């Protein structure tokens, strides 16, 4: 009977039906691109592919832990109930491990979970590790499922699922991984609780929410779907870009929930945006904090630009900040990947105050430098406490720009004299004014850097990568430049926020501020 149970425990259970109703859009978010080659699991020792049930998912995700998996000799596969030889580690001796024969008819042990330090009594009196009862940590599960770095499955959830399975080292198929994520709770609206409305726009409503799975706060961007038109192109664009952008200074897209009536994007929750932060400071920020925020903006942008992704809608409302001071780029609804340099894009893309003059004058051929003008405007706003060019119309915006930086000429902006829109406006001939007169809190290095951002010719604007190396950031130390992309700058002990001079310890009331909050998340 024991031999029969032993044989039965080595067989694999049949596959369960998988719900294939999730859209390809949700699949692309939850499945990493580099796993697309793994259409089916690797067959080991002549076994068929594993099933797609939750139990087999757990089996497949217990292979890469701190200790190497134990390999089963072919004689055991054939039915022998002898001892197993563990693989050696670091040249140490082989440990003898006996199979735990107390198995249920479904091949699962009916004993409680054990850890790698648990011991069982061998018939020969040797103390042995029980290889079946290995405790899987949250880190193990997150790594194997490629979950976002700040998602943590609670310990209680691991215990509830009884994740204690023999180690398997074969990779998981896309199909099986998708089913596993769904069984955990991803892609389901019931996994999230709506707490309060943060804002509402033409196409989307944003809620503050909580994940039942992790107890973490989330931002739920609920996009209404019209049956005639389907998902707005901005939503599709945002999802397609964010699923590939994994960086400490870019907002994390945790999940996608697709129903017949809506598409809900589940983002990490950050308490406020840069506009709210400046309001809380009475628009008088610490210049040290200005430097930290500017560096993080550049760091996130440099990552995007290396991947030929343009944000195209930079503004304080699209820069989210948490309590630590970590700043993250958000709202990629107008962003797009730049694959062909000469490709013509729509020129209706950027909020007016942060729109560069070449776009204001009708240029639709641009590159990553389109974002750098907006960085300069935001830099000035943080340092001075007021918007740099708060124009109400395109003409008014250009008027404010030319009055400060000087009306461009053929010498200062080659080709401008032949621009029809520029000629039609017939602007007065303004002379440039010293920027230090308008931002007296900036030092000479800061003035030099902001000047590099505010160049009429887009190709002359400093890149995000180059700006990070500017002498203005020298006081932050050298280690900040060597951080991995996924690591926050606040992981360095020398990087800390300072108290802002104008900070007032006040917050928005519980109600009445929804329309002013998180406008960055709306279409």
From Swiss-Prot:
One of its GO terms (molecular function) is ATP binding. It holds the Pfam family Pkinase. The keyword Ubl conjugation does not apply. Residues 30-55, 103-123, 501-523 are annotated as: Disordered. The active site is at 313 (proton acceptor). Residues 192-473 form the Protein kinase domain. Its EC number is 2.7.11.22. One of its GO terms (cellular component) is nucleus. SUPFAM superfamilies: Protein kinase-like (PK-like). One of its GO terms (biological process) is protein phosphorylation. PROSITE patterns: PROTEIN_KINASE_ATP, PROTEIN_KINASE_DOM, PROTEIN_KINASE_ST. SMART domains: S_TKc. It comes from the Eukaryota. InterPro entries: CDK, Kinase-like_dom_sf, Prot_kinase_dom, Protein_kinase_ATP_BS, Ser/Thr_kinase_AS. ATP binds at residues 198-206, 221. It is an enzyme of class 2 (transferase). It catalyses: L-seryl-[protein] + ATP = O-phospho-L-seryl-[protein] + ADP + H(+); L-threonyl-[protein] + ATP = O-phospho-L-threonyl-[protein] + ADP + H(+). Keywords: ATP-binding, Kinase, Nucleotide-binding, Phosphoprotein, Serine/threonine-protein kinase, Transferase. The keyword GTP-binding does not apply. May play a role in terminally differentiated neurons. Has a Ser/Thr-phosphorylating activity for histone H1. Belongs to the protein kinase superfamily. CMGC Ser/Thr protein kinase family. CDC2/CDKX subfamily. Found in a complex containing CABLES1, CDK16 and TDRD7. Interacts with TDRD7. This is Cyclin-dependent kinase 17. The gene is CDK17.
